[in-house]
From Swiss-Prot:
GO terms for cellular component: extracellular space; membrane. InterPro entries: TNF, TNF_beta, TNF_CS, TNF_dom, Tumour_necrosis_fac-like_dom. The keyword NAD does not apply. Residues 63-205 form the THD domain. It comes from Macaca mulatta (Rhesus macaque). Cytokine that in its homotrimeric form binds to TNFRSF1A/TNFR1, TNFRSF1B/TNFBR and TNFRSF14/HVEM. In its heterotrimeric form with LTB binds to TNFRSF3/LTBR. Lymphotoxin is produced by lymphocytes and is cytotoxic for a wide range of tumor cells in vitro and in vivo. GO terms for biological process: cell surface receptor signaling pathway; defense response to Gram-positive bacterium; humoral immune response; immune response; lymph node development; positive regulation of canonical NF-kappaB signal transduction; positive regulation of chronic inflammatory response to antigenic stimulus; positive regulation of extrinsic apoptotic signaling pathway. The keyword rRNA-binding does not apply. One of its GO terms (molecular function) is tumor necrosis factor receptor binding. This is Lymphotoxin-alpha. Residues 1-34 form the signal peptide. Belongs to the tumor necrosis factor family. Its main location: secreted. It is found in: Secreted; Membrane.
Length: 205
């Protein structure tokens, strides 16, 4: 009489290879990861199959914001979003001209301003101009505005040609949910307000 284990082995050996592979595939499929639609609800799986790029984008979005200066405000630097190339993404909000940090983490914070002016008249006495731009942090840990990034420059207008100066700075900071990011600028009447010259933003790393 043939032992049961030998009988089972003989049946396996006699099974066509393609049937064995099919059975193995059916066992592995429920635990497969990274395949479109696997491990998702029926509606989510259908969305992933129909719009794979959209599904990937929703799973990788991080908090980010990019603001530009409002050119209609000549005597103040007012930030605006949702216009031109400015935006608020994944929790960032703009309130009282400050960015509100949506979640705790490490963020890259950046800002740029560009100043310009005319040459002075030969009959006038040239007056040096003080230009400065600063990104500030206000949080529950520091109940006052703490400078994060700052630049300063003294400009001496020339006699022959107009002048132009830019300031850019950016760095990574550990921020807490609810922190407020704002700016302070000296020399606002000389700002060149356009989307490519005056901007302020942050994004999660």
């Amino acid at each position: 009489m043939t032992p049961p284990e030998r009988l089972f082995l003989s049946r396996v050996r006699g099974t066509p290879l393609h049937l064995l592979l099919l059975g193995l595939l059916l066992v592995l499929l429920p635990g497969a990861q990274g395949l479109p639609g696997v491990g998702l609800t029926p509606s989510a799986a259908q969305t992933a199959r129909q719009h794979p790029k959209m599904h990937l984008a929703h799973s990788t979005l991080k908090p980010a914001a990019h603001l530009i200066g409002d050119p209609s405000k000549q005597n103040s630097l007012l930030w605006r979003a949702n216009t031109d190339r400015a935006f608020l993404q994944d929790g960032f909000s703009l309130s009282n001209n400050s960015l509100l940090v949506p979640t705790s983490g490490i963020y890259f914070v950046y800002s740029q301003v560009v100043f310009s002016g005319k040459a002075y008249s030969p009959k006038a006495t040239p007056t040096p101009l003080y230009l400065a731009h600063e990104v500030q942090l206000f949080s529950s840990q520091y109940p006052f505005h703490v400078p994060l990034l700052s630049s300063q420059k003294m400009v001496y207008p020339g006699l022959q040609e107009p002048w132009l100066h830019s300031m850019y700075h950016g760095a990574a900071f550990q921020l807490t949910q609810g922190d407020q990011l704002s700016t302070h600028t000296d020399g606002i009447p000389h700002l060149v307000l356009s989307p490519s010259t005056v901007f302020f933003g942050a994004f999660a790393l």
